[in-house]
A protein has these predicted regions:
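A short, sequence-level motif marking secondary-structure junctions
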Residues: 40-42, 63-68, 195-199
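Metal-dependent nuclease catalytic core centered on acidic motifs
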Residues: 1-57, 199-222
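Interdomain/boundary linker segments immediately adjacent to catalytic/signaling cores
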Residues: 86-152, 203
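Mixed-charge (acidic/basic) macromolecular-recognition segments
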Residues: 54-112, 207, 214-222
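Acidic-basic catalytic patches of nuclease active cores, encompassing PD-(D/E)XK
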Residues: 137-173
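Conserved catalytic cores of phosphodiester-cleaving nucleases, focusing on short active-site segments
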Residues: 165, 181-183, 190-198
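Long, charged, glycine-rich C-terminal linkers/tails
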Residues: 174-185
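Generic structural hydrophobic/aromatic packing signal, biased to beta-strands
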Residues: 34-36, 47-49, 128, 146, ...
């Protein structure tokens, strides 16, 4: 369920949870995700199959509704996984790759480097990647700033807000370069500018010169 919540956070409309309850989740071990939900109004079952498109977003490729039992829904999921006619989306949008190599080693933020290369942060990296597939880069420099000394903190904060607003059932309007977010819910629209405090030049230097403590040093301070 937690994995499905991550990949479907921006694929499903926020208010669908008011009329349905997700019950079960399935995968074929490859690119397909299945789910079963209960219709809270009609008290019957619906099921769907999701696959990734070229932008790496999961989208519905098959949906079945008005099934009277969960057993019927499970059988439909099983049958759908075994079919050869599942559509694999193919559109013109390439995926938004926050971790692509920009050959910017001199200006790269060490926290970004740690996030990209350390196995310890691999789970966080995968979650950020899933979120970024749905993020619309309005001004065209998000990836460059996300990797940079001066931009990493603010861009991480923007991704956090992007998730927070969606989890709070807001929808987004991403048609303007400013402000950072225009969100709406219940016919109310809010404009938000994300602001962080820039590091002092000497603190930026401290980041680049920072060497992580060894396990022995850490244990000695506990």
């Amino acid at each position: 369920q937690k994995y499905f919540d991550i990949i479907a956070l921006f694929s499903r409309e926020p208010f669908v949870k008011l009329i349905t309850k997700e019950l079960e989740y399935y995968t074929d071990g490859s690119n397909l995700i299945g789910f079963i939900c209960l219709d809270l109004i009609d008290n019957n079952y619906s099921a769907g199959i999701l696959s990734r498109d070229k932008s790496m977003q999961y989208r519905a490729v098959k949906v079945n509704v008005d099934m009277q039992t969960i057993t019927e829904a499970r059988e439909w999921i099983k049958k759908s996984f075994n079919e050869d006619n599942i559509i694999q989306h193919d559109n013109h949008s390439e995926f938004f790759d926050l971790f692509k190599n920009l050959n910017n080693e001199k200006t790269i933020h060490p926290h970004y480097k740690l996030l990209k290369e350390s196995d310890f942060y691999s789970s966080a990296k995968e979650v950020i990647k899933e979120i970024s597939y749905h993020y619309k880069d309005i001004d065209g420099n998000f990836i460059d700033q996300f990797q940079s000394l001066n931009g990493f903190d603010s861009r991480i904060f923007e991704l956090y807000l992007f998730c927070f607003f969606r989890e709070q059932s807001f929808s987004f309007k991403r048609d303007f370069e400013a402000p950072d977010f225009i969100v709406n819910k219940m016919d109310k629209e809010i404009a938000i500018e994300a602001v962080t405090i820039s590091r002092k030049p000497e603190n930026v230097k401290n980041i680049t010169d920072y060497t992580p403590k060894s396990p022995d040093e850490i244990n000695s301070e506990l």
